[in-house]
């Protein structure tokens, strides 16, 4: 007969890897078409002019230019401003 009761096993001890979300291009940074500007879950930051919105709510550049973040009516918006050619 066993002199000790069987020890229970822990049911915790696992964790998922981070999803690498967040802002990928800062305000004023140069982008080309297709560059990812923000990776997010839901539209925390809304798309503005010259940016597209992917099915996973990723915001990406549609034109060459500089990134611009602004707030309008409590909504964060990201635009890409075209660089004036000399």
UniProtKB/Swiss-Prot annotation:
Q: Which GO terms describe its molecular function?
A: structural constituent of ribosome
Which controlled-vocabulary keywords does the entry list? Answer: Ribonucleoprotein, Ribosomal protein
Q: Where is this region: Disordered?
A: 1-24
Q: Name one GO biological process term.
A: translation
What is a single Pfam family found in this protein's UniProt entry?
Ribosomal_L27
Q: Identify one Gene Ontology CC term for this UniProt entry.
A: ribosome
Q: Does the keyword Chloroplast apply?
A: no
Extract the InterPro entries matched here. Ribosomal_bL27 (IPR001684), Ribosomal_bL27_CS (IPR018261)
Q: Which superkingdom heads the taxonomic lineage of this protein's source?
A: Bacteria
Q: Which family is this protein grouped under? A: Belongs to the bacterial ribosomal protein bL27 family.
HAMAP family in alphabetical order? Ribosomal_bL27
**Protein name stated in the entry:** Large ribosomal subunit protein bL27
Q: Give the classification, highest ranks.
A: Bacteria, Pseudomonadati, Pseudomonadota, Alphaproteobacteria, Rickettsiales
């Amino acid at each position: 007969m066993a002199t000790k009761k069987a020890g229970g096993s822990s049911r915790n001890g696992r964790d998922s890897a981070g999803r690498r979300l967040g802002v990928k291009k800062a305000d004023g940074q140069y982008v080309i078409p297709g560059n990812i500007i923000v990776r997010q879950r839901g539209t925390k930051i809304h798309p503005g002019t010259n940016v597209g919105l992917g099915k996973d709510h990723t915001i990406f550049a549609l034109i060459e230019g500089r990134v611009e973040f602004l707030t309008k009516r409590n909504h964060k918006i990201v635009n890409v401003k075209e660089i004036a050619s000399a």
